[in-house]
């Protein structure tokens, strides 16, 4: 059954998992949420530059007068949002994904419900990396540079905030220098 906003696919199939290639319109998002409300696992894609951008797109797909209910429905059904950017590897012609993972924990759910700023969700995502396996693009980009897999300038350009990325990388490099370790970004940071 092709799920193109079709309620029939949800009702007529006893599927545990529904895969939606891409949620391009409100009708498809509405159907996906309804399926999740019925207990089915729904996996889909959405074109967005970040996990928070995808979350925002889902909420703003609801008309203004339904947005509060939309927030509740999204917060109640969403379990995680994963975003990726493909970056060129330093050591080959291949690409490597920089991945952002936002799990919908109780605290993140509250942020969605109450329309709190995305900065709070980013902070919760950073703090939850050990407990929930979450990470921001910033954390992933730092890690890729530290592991010498991606060029510093490429990571900086891919960062949500290049100036913040540069400041954090400089701070990490300074801390390592004080400890007698190799700077985070090697020779590139001095450039």
Describe every region a protein language model picked out.
Residues 7, 30-34, 142:
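Alpha-helical segments flanking ligand/cofactor-binding loops in enzyme cores
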Residues 1-5, 9-10:
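Single conserved hydrophobic/aromatic residue that forms the stacking wall/gate
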Residues 10-12, 35, 118-121:
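A short alpha-helix capping/helix-coil boundary motif
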Residues 14-86:
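Conserved P-loop NTPase nucleotide-binding/switch module
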Residues 77-191:
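Conserved P-loop NTPase
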């Amino acid at each position: 059954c092709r799920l193109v906003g079709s309620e029939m696919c949800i009702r007529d199939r006893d599927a545990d998992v529904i895969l939606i290639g891409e949620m391009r319109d409100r009708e498809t998002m509405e159907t996906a949420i309804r399926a999740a409300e019925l207990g089915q696992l729904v996996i889909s894609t959405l074109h967005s530059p970040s996990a928070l951008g995808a979350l925002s797109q889902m909420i703003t797909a609801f008309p203004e007068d339904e947005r509060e209910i939309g927030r509740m429905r999204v917060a109640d059904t969403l379990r995680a949002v994963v975003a990726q950017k493909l970056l060129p590897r330093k050591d080959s012609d291949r690409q490597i994904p920089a991945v952002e993972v936002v799990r919908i924990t109780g605290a993140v759910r509250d942020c969605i419900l109450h329309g709190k700023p995305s900065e709070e969700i980013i902070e919760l995502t950073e703090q939850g990396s050990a407990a929930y396996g979450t990470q921001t693009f910033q954390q992933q980009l730092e890690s890729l540079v530290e592991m010498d897999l991606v060029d510093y300038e490429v990571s900086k350009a891919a960062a949500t905030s290049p100036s913040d990325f540069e400041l954090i990388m400089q701070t990490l490099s300074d801390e390592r220098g004080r400890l007698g370790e190799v700077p985070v970004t090697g020779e590139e940071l001095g450039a």
